[in-house]
Amino acid sequence: MMRPVVVKEKQIHVVEDEVRQAKTMDRDIVKHAMKQSVAKLNPKVMIKNPIMFVVEIGFVITFILSFLPSHSSSIPGWFNITVSLILLFTVLFANFAEALAEGRGKAQADSLKQSKKDVFANVVKENGEIVQVSATDLRKDDVVIVKQGEMIPSDGEVIKGLASVDESAITGESAPVIKEAGGDFCSVTGGTMVVSDEITIVITSNPGESFIDKMISLVEGAARQKTPNEIALNTVLTSLTLIFLIVVVTLPIFTNYLGFQIDTAVLVALLVCLIPTTIGGLLSAIGIAGMDRVTKFNVLAMSGKAVEAAGDINTIILDKTGTITFGNRMAHTLLPVGNETIEQVGKWAAISSVLDETPEGRSVIEYVQAKSISYNRELAEQGEFIPFKAETRMSGVDLQDGTKVRKGAVGSVIEWVRSQGGTIPKDVNQKADFISKEGGTPLVVAVDNRIYGLIYLKDTVKPGMRERFEQLRQMGIKTVMCTGDNPLTAATIAKEAGVDEFVAECKPEDKIAVIKAEQDKGKLVAMTGDGTNDAPALAQADVGLAMNSGTTAAKEAANMIDLDSNPTKIIEVVGIGKQLLMTRGALTTFSIANDIAKYFAIIPAMFTLAIPQMEALNIMKLTSPLSAILSALLFNAVIIPLLIPLAMKGIAYKPMSSNALLGRNLLIYGLGGVIVPFIGIKIIDMIVGLFI
């Protein structure tokens, strides 16, 4: 009775340790980000963000002015230094947001670097001699033998043997995967370990070009480039900043004409409040955090452009097998023929499957047991198993008493029964056609010269796929299923799964044709694949998600790689892309809406003394002109760190149409962006008013 308690206590301690380590790591990331926020004050770094660079220049100007005698009697000596400090913290907060996002990526890179240990490889020379060399000395096309318990030294493809490989260092999945020569599962990754048997691989990458090297480079941000959307938005924001800069610089000309002067510090404060500093300070963090969210989802995006493109996808091309369906045909029901009973069909179907280790064979046993149909297992185990062959298209067992039991393709079993001198029941082909039209695969069960019935094998649609496709439909995304099945079977699966369109008897070149046809309509297309024959289509698609278990050609052609090798993850990737675009759009809306309240705070404060009628614009009833300016600046600075969690996590995303999303975001972040600063500035003014 005590052992389960002990196990639970151990599990609790493990969880507590993991939580403690996560908190420690978060503290380390925050500390590093705080240091980096100061280091990023370097003008060479700041100029990459023109908006915050203008704020930094404003800090320098007001800081210098604080040590010079003031020519304005209305501006006290402490005002300039206060403004300069607020501007400094505004820049520091923006730098902190970017450094925090980068820090999370670097933490992931550090964990990946731990998997790059000093590894030695057994290289096979041309003369057959085996030489041990360091993994760093390996070059492309070198042939290496990797034995049980050894680390795979670099990326490669299996050319001989079969082995179980532990890829947990890369994918986080503890269950080993089978790698073998030929086919779509020959690709191996450096840093993974062979846990059984032995394989010979040919190296496919030079030092510094391996999969792990690329991952480290990407998550560290070294390879990160601004996306087209990010560049376009940055250009718009920079243009706004330039326009407001011209307005502020020329403003003294008009105020002199009106007979009064505006202090330089007030002009700087006006400029900072006018320009979109909120989104300017968070823009880089949003992009980096978007990449980070994809990486945490165990998907490696080759660029931020790929993540953004996922958010704009209009069409998704999906393989049926393994994506929409489980890929394993399972026994769905039994159909007796002639005067036979379902118990007789089940009995002989089970006997033919006892020694059959295929998923189909096991599913027959499970079905018969679930239906409580009795059969003699020992009788089958004592017989001689006849495995499935492409030539015969049948499998079964020859019993010790000479009885021959077979199950297999309709035509093959019918031909075999006729060769035994048997007759064919009239309803065999009729029931076989019925199964095919239902989207299933018929297997005929026969004993010697007598057919007993059919096994209805069905490739089951994964649970929840219809609901997920409905969500995509609400988002305006069309789903297209590609399958090698005949049109009848394809139509049945498509209807059951709820996809919009399907392509039956599809060949690899047909996928490219489908992608090009959609792109010719102005659509952005995403697809998944794992084989060499998928590589051209993955390269053609706007978003190509390759499986990590697939071939090197597929992974090189794609712009995203799923480390878990789960094709359905393309749906989640699209959601992350949309969340990234929505977060950027929502915070841009919020930032620009903020300016409305800041105008009502700072503009009356600047002009009330010269133009008393401007007091009518002081709808917030702020304490004094100086208090109004400082309150607007303080809110402008404080809102950046308050929005960092939202920028990092992304705004809540729900599948809906583009128009519905636009209306929702305008209501929440547009109207909210107007209301929040009115409240925030008023509260800050009440506090500041106590001290001035």
From Swiss-Prot:
Membrane topology: Multi-pass membrane protein
Regions annotated as coiled coil: none
Cellular location(s): Cell membrane
The keyword Aminoacyl-tRNA synthetase is assigned to this record: no
Pfam families referenced in this protein's UniProt entry, alphabetically: E1-E2_ATPase, Hydrolase
PROSITE patterns, per database record: ATPASE_E1_E2
Recorded catalytic activity of this chain's protein: K(+)(out) + ATP + H2O = K(+)(in) + ADP + phosphate + H(+)
Catalytic residue list: D319
Binding of Mg(2+), residues: D530, D534
Source organism, top-level taxon: Bacteria
Molecular functions per Gene Ontology: ATP binding; ATP hydrolysis activity; magnesium ion binding; P-type potassium transmembrane transporter activity
Catalytic activity, EC: 7.2.2.6
Main localization (coarse): membrane
Transmembrane segment boundaries: 50-70, 74-94, 240-260, 266-286, 600-620, 628-648, 672-692
Keywords: ATP-binding, Cell membrane, Ion transport, Magnesium, Membrane, Metal-binding, Nucleotide-binding, Phosphoprotein, Potassium, Potassium transport, Translocase, Transmembrane, Transmembrane helix, Transport
Annotated ATP binding sites: D356, E360, F388, K389, A390, E391, T392, R393, M394, S395, K407
InterPro entries associated with the record: ATPase_P-typ_cyto_dom_N (IPR023299), ATPase_P-typ_P_site (IPR018303), ATPase_P-typ_TM_dom_sf (IPR023298), ATPase_P-typ_transduc_dom_A_sf (IPR008250), HAD-like_sf (IPR036412), HAD_sf (IPR023214), P-type_ATPase_bsu_IA (IPR006391), P_typ_ATPase (IPR001757)
GO cellular-component term (any): plasma membrane
Subunit structure comment from the entry: The system is composed of three essential subunits: KdpA, KdpB and KdpC.
Role this protein plays: Part of the high-affinity ATP-driven potassium transport (or Kdp) system, which catalyzes the hydrolysis of ATP coupled with the electrogenic transport of potassium into the cytoplasm. This subunit is responsible for energy coupling to the transport system and for the release of the potassium ions to the cytoplasm.
Family, as annotated: Belongs to the cation transport ATPase (P-type) (TC 3.A.3) family. Type IA subfamily.
Protein name, UniProt field: Potassium-transporting ATPase ATP-binding subunit
Organism: Bacillus thuringiensis (strain Al Hakam)
